[in-house]
Amino acid sequence: MSVRQNRFFLRVLTCLGIACVVPPGAGKPGPALAAAVPASHANVALQRIGVAPNHRGFLRIPSRRPFYPWGFNYGNHGRLIEDFWDTHWSTVVRDFHNMRELGANVVRVHLQYGKFMLAPDKPNPISFKLLSRLLRLAEKDRLYLDLTGLACYRVSDIPKWYNAMNDRQRRKAQENFWRDIAATCAGSHAVFCYDLINEPVVPGSRRKPGQWQPKSSFGGYDFLQFITLNPGRTRRTEVAVQWINAMTRAIRSRDKQTLITVGLLPWIPKWGWLSGFVPRIIGPHVSFISIHIYPRTGKLNQAMEVLRRCAVGKPVVIEETFPLSCSAAEEQKFLLASRTTACGWLGHYDGLTLQDYRKLSREHRLTIGEAIYRSFEQMFVKLKPDFVRRQPARH
């Protein structure tokens, strides 16, 4: 089973409530996890995040204090935020508070194109109003947002007119999306970065009209997306750079400062996807490198090889990681080893806290998926002191 299928499998298990045999005491946190995170925080305004002068990390501006992204990709019981934020805003408020209490300083939110655009040049006012509300919530909880856009994870949420577009039309529509997002967010320091698209791919040859997804879906979701159907004779890496530059120009027309990145698939043949987005080539065109790495049992060396390929003179953030294809101990080993290259780390949150998992375990109702989420949250709390360091910024 592939890493991508494992991710879907986890969601299916969680949603279906398939039980696992997990003794109530299994995975019980030790003393390091028992310490409660402070329930309240000083009312200090968020500062803008920028790249450190040595290009190896991030700084808060203007204080120049170092900033280490440490947080979660946000979901709630397998749902996307647009599935419930208009009708159950209190769930978003609770989850953001809980992620902060677990020690997060960054939350990655995936914005579905079809929920934000009613037409190629017509934004959905309801979704943009909710995005503004999300910015205010993040500012209140002092959580930074990794806003990942152009998401087309569910076929049912993709407008037919969007998939019917040719390359030129679709790129223009994507530029409109990012221009509107940037115009909404430019005044808020709560935005850590704009992630232009999740796991983009440049095809090696011409694709049929409408085939913007690579048919890698499982359980109704597809996290990959082609950025062109007809690369022609242009090198795949050049197509990637041209696309990044087009989206960046759209953003910079409204927001001159917020960091920009792209959520990358691993760029080694052993991992099955050669996307055309090569870190050393796109590096000069983004603020930092974002990579998605799910270590595999017995193959930590491959995960580290992926990470080393990202060391191209820009900060490196592991934007997605989780013990899907390995044990929690192996995931922890990878995270600790990754500090030689990475300066930011985001796992996954799905709506429950350690207290919730303990209750489910006592009641013998903990599912396989929930047990995996619990193991990651335990690790997340335990490792934070080693990852969110306090030393002065390096110049």
Located regions from the model:
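Active-site mouth of glycoside hydrolases
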Residues: 43-288, 298, 321, 325-326, ...
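Substrate-binding cleft of secreted/luminal carbohydrate-active enzymes
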Residues: 315-395
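Short beta-strand-loop-alpha-helix junction that forms the active-site gateway
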Residues: 294
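Signal peptide processing junction and immediate N-terminal pro/mature segment
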Residues: 23-36
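Bacterial N-terminal signal peptides
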Residues: 11-23
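Bacterial N-terminal signal peptides that target proteins for export
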Residues: 2-13
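P-loop/Walker A phosphate-binding loop and immediately adjacent motor/lid segment at beta-alpha junctions
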Residues: 257, 301-324
